[in-house]
């Protein structure tokens, strides 16, 4: 045998050298591990800009717009002082503006952006260079999308450059309550700090509430209010605060036209907005009465996703012009709506709608989680399942062969006083093995709860159960696309996220209660898993008896 061993060692083949700089893909393609596989996608900008890069070379008191545009496009971040300067400088300009802006045509009107920075860049391609084009944005720059702070910083930088040709109104998401509930606060803390978030909240309170365009159109984010009789009512609002949950300021940000606008079955001008959980639905007669009283042509608003990016409502009897128009400028909203976006260009008394589609963008896991936080519950559940499968070494016949036991198979053995325990005894070892196996079963159920929570952490949730169909997120983007097939499906599924959210304390309370119920259910299922209990008992009984000498 020694001779064979020596011969095997002498004839041992050398370990082949592996070139780890090359990787063979599933289709046989060789790619370099030292380069980006998808070369047309730029690498993220890892370095924060110097002051020379940040400030414009020709206007050293203003940020370099071209640099910011490309830097944000590559997911770059600014220093905290640079970001804070943009927000605070923009805030000072916004504070100087009245509640009700007035501007003339030509102008391009834009709806919700919702943190879709890459689509915002497409918007400027379609609408025109801000250096040469007048813009009015109707609010909702943040939340839901994962590039909200980039949208704020770039739009505020544009406001610094073009204070008299680019205007920003407030949307219902520009407030502390919604940004805390959705994604913007988390995004600010992840990419910058809470200091940047607080500066943004202060700036949001300075945003004007409405605009009159060309003395013909009232432009607002939400809609009309029973407290809005004349334009003077808007001028008297104290806007420098968190929006209230009722009243004129709330309605300007939250109200919607009735779903059957123009074909109402009620004579009421305003009814409670059951979809939003606050404010009102306003009717066609209410819109016509307001327009006629204020000598206006139409109300231009945003606030609602539209399949085509816009919607023209019923025309008024006196002017033949749409009484209300909705503009929505976030294409493929939440990456599942499959909607077009639109901007409204008004020039020489001619109104044109320009539509555009979504632009590819980098992917973020829900709530800015890293891959380990996201995947650990999935991995943990599978590992514990594998461990239970390994422990289950008994045949079907063995499991059916009941072993006498004085303790219920569904319950772990009760602890024994340590001063009376013989740790070398067979009974002690059997109890320990049995309890450990049952603990693994409970751990498996806990990981299942955590995995379900990970699946549920998505911006698009079903009204039934608060999440997409089980397993959808494990299937990736294709699974989501199959679950949500069209715009109307997505809109119905997402209705609960269009409501005024509950308070922070209520959200925490509900979350803790849901987790407690889920963990109790997991504990109950584990304790009543007769198969696992039988395996635990059978394995523990295989420990040989020990005899004392």
Curated annotation (Swiss-Prot):
Catalytically driven reaction(s): O-phospho-L-seryl-[protein] + H2O = L-seryl-[protein] + phosphate; O-phospho-L-threonyl-[protein] + H2O = L-threonyl-[protein] + phosphate
CDD domains membership: MPP_PP2B
Enzyme Commission code(s) on record: 3.1.3.16
UniProt cross-references to Pfam families, sorted A to Z: Metallophos
Region (Disordered), start-end ranges: 399-421
Binding site for Zn(2+): 140, 172, 221, 303
Record-level GO BP terms: calcineurin-mediated signaling; cellular response to calcium ion; fungal-type cell wall organization; G1/S transition of mitotic cell cycle; negative regulation of calcium ion import across plasma membrane; positive regulation of mitotic actomyosin contractile ring contraction; positive regulation of mitotic division septum assembly; regulation of cell morphogenesis
Residues annotated as the enzyme's active site: 173
Cofactor note: Binds 1 Fe(3+) ion per subunit. Binds 1 zinc ion per subunit.
Cofactors: Fe(3+); Zn(2+)
GO molecular function: calcium-dependent protein serine/threonine phosphatase activity; calmodulin binding; calmodulin-dependent protein phosphatase activity; metal ion binding
Role, per record: Calcium-dependent, calmodulin-stimulated protein phosphatase. This subunit may have a role in the calmodulin activation of calcineurin.
Protein name per UniProt: Serine/threonine-protein phosphatase 2B catalytic subunit
Taxonomic lineage of the native organism: Eukaryota, Fungi, Dikarya, Ascomycota, Pezizomycotina
Gene of this entry: cnaA
